[in-house]
Amino acid sequence: MKHSKLTAAVTAVLAAALLAPGAHAQKLVPVKVQLKWFPQAQFAGFFVAQAKGYYKAEGLDVQFLPTGDQSPIQTVATGTADFGTTWITDLLTARAQGIPVVHIAQLFQKSGYTLVALKSSNITKPQDFKGKRVGVWPSGNEYPAVALLKKYGLTTSLDSTVSNPDVQAVTYPFDPSIVFPDKVDLVSAMTYNEIDQIVGLGYSLDKLRIFRTADYGINLLEDLMFTTDRTLKTANFKGSGQSGQQIAAKLVRATLKGWNYAVTHQAEAVSIVLPLCGNTCKGSGTRADAKSHQTWQMAEVAKLYNTGPTTRGLAGYLDPAVYRNNVALLRNLGILKASPDAGAVTYSVWEAATGKKAPR
């Protein structure tokens, strides 16, 4: 009887020791993520997931790599990063070039791309773009503008085969103050970033005519999460004893949790983002204050996350109909010569992360 009591006591002590904090601390799996741009509220869900410990709760030690000269496609494809964020145009064109990148979650389910003109220019519809100068971004970021122009039968100076284009495209490095409104009649602007910068330059919203490409059927999807075929097929990710597929699902699950929190706690999300970005968080002119600009940005990206009649309640889900539309748009532009292979998108990671069956 005494022996039984002693055994029970020892067992209880051992159990308490095993349950004590740090007694058997889980070894976190290192994961590197390359974001598409500098830290800002555009990526709030990631930073909130980090700050709230959502990644650690999944057993992940997530490191965000600083934005450099290389694109996320390059850093992920070469193995410098394990996962990344990019736009669907970048992912599909890379896949078409034989780079084995794979879409695993769609964060922004509506495009935030716009073309902005002054109301005083009397540009009221896309047909009025003819004979105008349009400011566009380089490196594939011009595709939404080109797609909109093509839809309305307008050619651009970006097409070297056209001798007398309808629209003069002016490529510039993202800052609208460089070209607008003196050097271009319309300028590219994301709802969550450059529009606020333009307002800061002294052009209030009531003075602007904003053409949102999604409103004209050009809903080329933006921020998504991706990895490579190689990572998803890895049986033992970095010696963790877990497959790449399992790690991907954990990363997506924690990231979506971070996004869900950020969207519903926007002020707190902004407070988490601000210390991470410094000058890169600032706007322009009267909107230069980082907190003001990031508050605007957080409110606007929240409108892009988990939106649409078929995706509401399905955060991170890629609507197949929207995807097919995006492929058709890129093929129509001649950017894709053929439809992507089936491996360009996987729903298995999203299903494992959410415990839901992806509607098809």
Predicted regions located by residue number:
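Bacterial N-terminal signal peptides that target proteins for export
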Residues: 1-10
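Short, glycine-/small- and polar/acidic-enriched structural segments
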Residues: 26-181, 185-192, 211-213, 218-219
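Conserved C-terminal helix/tail region of periplasmic/extracytoplasmic solute-binding proteins
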Residues: 320-360
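Pocket-lining segment of extracytoplasmic ligand-binding domains
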Residues: 89-90, 172-282
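Sec/Tat signal peptide C-region and signal peptidase I cleavage site
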Residues: 19-25
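Secondary-structure end/capping motifs
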Residues: 236-335
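Bacterial N-terminal signal peptides
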Residues: 9-18
